[in-house]
Amino acid sequence: MSENAETFAFQAEIAQLMSLIINTFYSNKEIYLRELISNASDALDKIRYQALTEPSELDTGKELFIKITPNKEEKTLTIMDTGIGMTKADLVNNLGTIAKSGTKAFMEALQAGADISMIGQFGVGFYSAFLVADKVVVTSKNNDDDSYQWESSAGGSFVVRPFNDPEVTRGTKIVMHIKEDQIDFLEERKIKEIVKKHSQFIGYPIKLVVEKEREKEVEDEEAVEAKDEEKKEGEVENVADDADKKKTKKIKEKYFEDEELNKTKPIWTRNPDDISNEEYAEFYKSLSNDWEDHLAVKHFSVEGQLEFRALLFVPQRAPFDLFENKKSKNSIKLYVRRVFIMENCEELMPEYLNFIKGVVDSEDLPLNISREMLQQSKILKVIRKNLVKKCMELIDEVAEDKDNFKKFYEQFGKNLKLGIHEDSTNRKKLSDFLRYSTSAGDEPTSLKEYVSRMKENQTQIYYITGESKDVVAASAFVERVKSRGFEVLYMCDPIDEYCVQQLKEYDGKKLVSVTKEGLELPETEEEKKKFEEDKVAYENLCKVIKDILEKKVEKVGVSNRLVSSPCCIVTSEYGWSANMERIMKAQALRDSSTMGYMAAKKHLEINPDHAIMKTLRDRVEVDKNDKTVKDLVVLLFETALLASGFSLEEPQSHASRIYRMIKLGLDIGDDEIEDSAVPSSCTAEAKIEGAEEDASRMEEVD
């Protein structure tokens, strides 16, 4: 058969990964067994699911099990399953030539100091065999192909050949040639310990071939010889007494026997009161391939018109690919009457709860249900509704412990905000879980706590969105609100923009952005009167500014939100904020037509108490066609854009204006600068008309 052997090179990333696994010291090498058993369990799941619609698939072997055989003499450990098996193409692709999406991510995580036990989460668990083996031989038989053998000593290549193994009628057999310094993994005690620790809740029998001793009676040849001597001496024998009884002796004989290591019944079928935290932790790890314990668990059953049991877990941390749409998540396993149906039942959980791990075991769904049928199933819709309700309870329980909830929120806060955007039914409940930094202190606060601290005359919840806490805390928009003693929520996560589009109010209080038009702060009669007077006093300046800026702004008006800044740019109540515009511009597949009408409505608000605005108003009153006014207005507008969180369409012309101001401040005339030092494109557009004669007047504005 060797003439039919084909040699393949490992894909570059896989070769690198194997080199890393082989040449780096890892203390917890035992996880290789967990990974291989987990893969075997997946293969058994697949054949069992296939057999629901095609029972003949099990003609090649009815019994579904995993068998572990240690051989101390040959220093090999064999793991065999009667699962779906692999075709030749599967062996070539899955075990070497096609890198999984997680290969590179796992290597980066390893190099960053992650634990080797994370390997299963990245879909490359098979290669952990090389933690303990220097050569691995895989024989596999799929019902749709002949039997083939894969072999590698991890030297950058592997061999695939046709190979018939009478023991493998369907499924996969992995023979690991154990390294000299790892032979303790062949010890029965060690294997039992690892299986109990990592794999006791696998849904198929895990059999270990154990060596045992038994006493066996054999004929005692020495006693027979002595008896013959007696007969020769002519002694009379009492026939009735001991009717030719044979003399025997007991000897010890070695034999092999299959011992089942995981006889525990499915944990979700047991009474929650009888299950320890350690058992939940072990089940969670075997279910999720996580190396850490879970953060929280919910174990319940629903009875009545509909019956199902469920066991749900919240992990300690979010997986690296939590929001990767293309990747199917390993979240909820669906069982029907203890029979595994599918690995990841997306229909059971909304997208925003995709971090929840667990199992659901239904009594009512048909065994042969397909994904298409699931989408139409009314039973499933009821189960889903119950699961989401229980998830809310579970998060509520986590929230009772402040430290635990802080951990949870750091990892899954984005999911809750996505839920507010997507799930109108549970929006109110989800909003209770939100936490934000505020102008009142460093500790994140809930909306409920914010409302409890609101001033008597405050009717709205104020918030600002932005890139970071430091940026929003220093923003011009929060000046007046903070100075009046009102608390402002700081929303610094891009998803907050989508969240507040749906979360219009909380506890009857409207959420209001301090960066948008229509901000109403509680005012005294005196303040209202002053504001009206300011509007009249600055009416002419507002008109001149609007004429200069033309279509760049929709409206120019007097502000009630500024204290130390001369002006700011606000957006219409229903348009995008500056932060949202920034986020949308960063979208590779953005809709440019949406950008047009959502991002265009900018309003310039001026501070009537600021010296710059007062001087500018006086300048306009004297001569509204003053040559410097136009450039000052444009410069103020562009600076306000930047300060308000927007980006400039023409940053170069803004830079040129700034340089011109610096020249004026330093009393540098144009004749002192060589023409070659200033690009013609800049001077043409950016030159301030009448700059020379107005140099002294610019100082007044300062």
Swiss-Prot record:
Compositionally biased intervals (Basic and acidic residues): 224-235, 686-702
One GO cellular component, as annotated: cytoplasm
Short sequence motif named TPR repeat-binding, residue ranges: 698-702
InterPro entries: HATPase_C_sf, HSP90_C, Hsp90_fam, Hsp90_N, Ribosomal_Su5_D2-typ_SF
Disordered as annotated region, ranges: 218-239, 676-702
Subunit structure: Homodimer. Interacts (via TPR repeat-binding and central region) with pph-5 (via phosphatase domain); the interaction promotes pph-5 phosphatase activity. Interacts (via central region) with co-chaperone cdc-37 (via N-terminus); the interaction inhibits daf-21 ATPase activity.
Domain notes from UniProt: The TPR repeat-binding motif mediates interaction with TPR repeat-containing proteins.
Name recorded for this polypeptide: Heat shock protein 90
Phylogenetic placement of the source organism: Eukaryota, Metazoa, Ecdysozoa, Nematoda, Chromadorea
